[in-house]
Amino acid sequence: MEGNDLDKYRFPKTLSEQNRIIGLPLDEAIPAAVVLLWGFFTKKYLFSLIIAAVIWQLIRAAKCGKSSRWLYNWCYWYLPTELFRVVYRVIPDSSFRKWIK
């Protein structure tokens, strides 16, 4: 492969490398950022900062050192499927727990 061909691909330094925002994984950063933005627009800066920190700690405690994929899988199996229809148009309902071949 030449230099131009390699530019098409992304090679992570480690296998566990994942996208991060300010050092936080996306599943921890996005809920906290939403709360911070809400607090910014409603001018409740300190309240939103405290709530964002609490949400961040709750997500970290729920994960218990597991990966982000574990949290996504837990949400798929235990939360209503309608929550995922926004992102995933074709996703089977989690109540159908048997694989169909």
Swiss-Prot record:
Q: Which InterPro entries match?
A: Pilus_assmbly_TraL, T4SS_TraL
Does Membrane show up as a keyword for this record?
A: yes
Mainly localized where? Answer: membrane
Tell me, which GO biological process terms does this entry list?
pilus assembly
Record's GO cellular component, any one? cell outer membrane
Question: Under what name is this protein listed?
Answer: Protein TraL
**Topologically, how does it sit relative to the membrane?**
Peripheral membrane protein
Q: What does this protein do?
A: Membrane protein involved in F pilin formation.
Native source species: Salmonella typhi
Matches recorded under NCBIfam families = TraL_TIGR
Arranged from A to Z, the UniProt key words for this protein are: Cell outer membrane, Conjugation, Membrane, Plasmid
Any Pfam family matching the protein: TraL
Where does the protein end up? Answer: Cell outer membrane
Q: State the encoding gene.
A: traL
